[in-house]
From Swiss-Prot:
Belongs to the orbivirus NS3 family. Signal peptide: none annotated. This is Non-structural protein NS3. InterPro entries: Orbi_NS3 (IPR002565). It comes from African horse sickness virus 5. Coiled coil: none annotated. May play a role in the release of virions from infected cells.
Amino acid sequence: MNLAAIAKNYSMHNGESGTIVPYVPPPYNFASAPTFSQRTSQMESVSLGILNQAMSSTTGASGALKDEKAAFGAMAEALRDPEPIRQIKKQVGIRTLKNLKMELATMRRKKSALKIMIFISGCVTLATSMVGGLSIVDDEILGDYKNNDWLMKTIHGLNLLCTTVLLAAGKISDKIQEEISRTKRDIAKRESYVSAASMSWNGDTEMSLQGIKYGES
């Protein structure tokens, strides 16, 4: 059998081997920019990480640590909000910060005035109490004290009045201090939100923090 017959016989038994198979190129993975859903998921991951950082820190017994926790929460909220809402809250927060700082300055002036009042009332109360104490120790002072009825009434009246003012001013000062702490915490939250809303975001976990600040005032 010659070569031509062998080739013909092979092609008859293996006819399918000569069919043309269309070429399908292998798939290629092209690099693409992060989609909106990916970006949102990454922002939520960063927000969750910030909240975990706030919860894993110290108990926040002092005012500074409480302000820090409030700042962490505000930053997490800023990263979790959509972009339009974030910009709206940023503009509103900038305007609100001015009013809050004015209120804080007013409350600090009131507290300073109350401190002066407490100091004066305390001095008068101490002086009148010392006069009453000396009248018990010294018989001569006690005699003059009893002979001058108007002096006794004046000293007792001043002592009672200044003691009442001292107690009332102390309670008012404590309430003002609570309002000051609450206002400072609100300022810290809004400053942190505005700072977080101004951060640059390039789609990865590296962010450029533009002067994150809280509780300055």
